[in-house]
Amino acid sequence: MIPIFFVTFAPKLQIIYIFNMAIIKTVEGKTPQWGKNCFIAENAVLTGDCILGDDCSIWYSAVLRSDVDAIRCGNRVNVQDCACIHQTGTMPCILEDDVSVGHGAIVHGATVREGALIGMNATVLDKAEIGEGAIIAAGAVVTHGTKVPAHEIWAGIPAKKVKACAPGQAEEFAKHYSGYIKDWYLKED
């Protein structure tokens, strides 16, 4: 990483690290960290107390902004293009192992359990909890404090249960996304 120093109108000197041209910004003395074999796109943004596990992929124009609380991502987490992961001053944002966050989705101060899928342009609001292997449909809005049980599909505004997931449905999504990072972006030439 290359540190870049610049002066802002704020009273503190800002330090921004450039990693593979992604913006990795220290906030309140905390710098984002990531495990082995992670792909971070050239224009992704990670700030503050953000920790990624191994084999994660943060795609183009995705933002993981942890300026007032923590963001924790397990292993094999996939945050796709233009998605935003943020937290509140009282609630971290937690994405457990094998979570996939679709293009343009927002996860704000919520917990997403292992193997869950957040569809494209869906919104998951503060203190919501998405159960293991659950699927939130594209464009759905999971409202403040909603608890989505494991292995259910929810859709709509506000999101409601549509049906139970088919056996192995969420696992199939997780395999697909972990495959293309290895097949396309981390393969050796």
Predicted features by range, described:
Residues 14-57, 63, 183-189:
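Extended, small-residue-rich solenoid/repeat segments and analogous flexible loops
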Residues 52-75, 80:
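Well-ordered, non-transmembrane segments within structured domains
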Residues 22-30, 67, 73-75, 81-87, ...:
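Glycine-rich hexapeptide-repeat left-handed beta-helix
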Residues 7-10:
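Acidic, Ala/Val/Gly-enriched low-complexity intrinsically disordered segments
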